């Protein structure tokens, strides 16, 4: 069991920067009340966040940059530093050429292989609408948008 976990961690580190993903999501949680993007309410992980921002990275990064600048100049705000950190972390992912948006905005996974066990408790075939991106053409990171029978 321990060896399997270690192998999994090694694979994850090789294919995608997972530790930074955790940091990215922590920072996002601290400042999400300052963001007025539509996807904020449906973002439950760093994967969701990146998939959303990749949908129109120029728009989101410009807005986030402006918001961070505005908050940094506002002496009453304590979120400026965190917004700037969120911008830096997101920018690092977006400019990483290994990230590619999936060509189709939604795809169907009939095998449910991308579902985690707790999300597919019935073990029945379900139609899953996915969005996401690939990292280095090796790892596909999906966000589950909808599950239907």
Segments (PLM) and residue ranges:
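Extended, amphipathic alpha-helical stalk segments that mediate dimerization
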Residues: 1-149
């Amino acid at each position: 069991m321990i060896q399997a976990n270690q192998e999994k961690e090694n694979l994850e580190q090789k294919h995608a920067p997972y530790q930074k993903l955790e940091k990215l999501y922590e920072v996002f949680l601290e400042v999400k009340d300052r963001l007025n993007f539509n996807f904020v309410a449906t973002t439950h992980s760093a994967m969701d966040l990146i998939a959303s921002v990749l949908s129109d990275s120029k728009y989101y990064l410009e807005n986030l940059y402006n918001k961070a600048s505005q908050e940094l100049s506002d002496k009453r705000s304590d979120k400026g530093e965190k917004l700037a950190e969120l911008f830096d972390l997101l920018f690092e992912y977006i400019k990483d050429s290994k990230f590619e948006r999936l060509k189709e905005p939604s795809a169907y996974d009939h095998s449910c292989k991308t579902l985690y066990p707790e999300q597919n408790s019935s073990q029945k075939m379900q139609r899953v609408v996915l969005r996401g991106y690939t990292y280095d053409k090796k790892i596909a990171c999906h966000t589950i948008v909808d599950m239907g029978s």
